[in-house]
Amino acid sequence: MTQKVRHTDRAFAYANGIEIAYDTLGDPAADPLLLINGLGGQLITWHEGFCAELAARGYRIIRFDNRDVGLSTKFDQAGVPDLSPLTADQERGKEVEAPYTLRDMADDAIGLLDALNVSSAHVVGTSMGGRIAHLMAICYPHRIRTLTSVMASMGEPGFPPPKPEVLSVLMEPAPTNRQAYIESSLVSARALGGRGFPLDEAFIREAAGKAFDRGSNPDGITRQLAALMAAASNKSELKSLRVPSLIIHGSDDPLIPVECAIDIANTIPGAQLLIIEGMGHSLMDIPGVWSQVIDAVARHTI
């Protein structure tokens, strides 16, 4: 049963030169646990039921909007990158230009911890958020108590590419109409899901509607994607990481193959690996997998 936990109202912090929207759940005196979203995810993407269960395990949960989404600072003055030439540059191994970098986003997260007077925290990042969490651990190891990397890669070449039908869905601009946005979210969830966990379409529609109403920003998502495309592999840095690390991945991930998770676990000294059978590239959309992830994080952060 989900226990009732303390919850902050919507708040903003000045971090790394921008405004970051955040909230917290749980005992303010408990061990801090920072949640970092993937591409386009807002803080509410971390479902409150999931966060409440984590908080009930004895954590102060901190969730936030990455730059350019939700209620955090937008970078509209940077324009909207054209993804076609960026994709061509990436395929040719050329340097990809982006309005900002994943390192900037890692610095945002560290700045948020500074603003909250949190000297160190457990960090959990999903997908792009996993890459951001890697950079936090590489650049600020003394600030990271433990690292949990979920559905992420190191940006290392040579792995099977995403399935074309999945990539085409993700490269589509997010609709600016509410109903179209909800339907697009459902299409994405179907493309990213795994065989082991059936989709709850009503659950996904409700979450998508809330996300649209709160702060959908298609241009910001495109800029985030450009930052992700521009990011170099961090494998060499992770080889010498001394932060306790847990790698979680789905066996059926159609976007980032499970081999990427195995590679991360083999790269970070002492890293633990949890492969969830039947899970795709989705976590918050499938409440049936939450307990496995929460149990694993709780064991890892003891």
Regions found by a protein language model. Name each.
Residues 14, 18-92:
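Conserved HGGG/HGGXW glycine-rich cap/lid loop of the alpha/beta-hydrolase fold
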Residues 91-99, 103-121:
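Conserved acidic catalytic loop of the alpha/beta-hydrolase fold
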Residues 130-141, 147:
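Short glycine-enriched nucleophile-adjacent loop
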Residues 138, 146-176:
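Flexible "cap/lid" loop of the alpha/beta hydrolase fold
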Residues 162-236, 263:
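Alpha/beta-hydrolase
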Residues 241, 247-249, 253:
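Short beta-strand/loop motif that positions the catalytic acidic residue
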Residues 254-260:
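Conserved alpha/beta-hydrolase "acid-adjacent" motif
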Residues 271-302:
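Catalytic active-site module of serine/aspartate enzymes centered on a nucleophile-bearing elbow/loop
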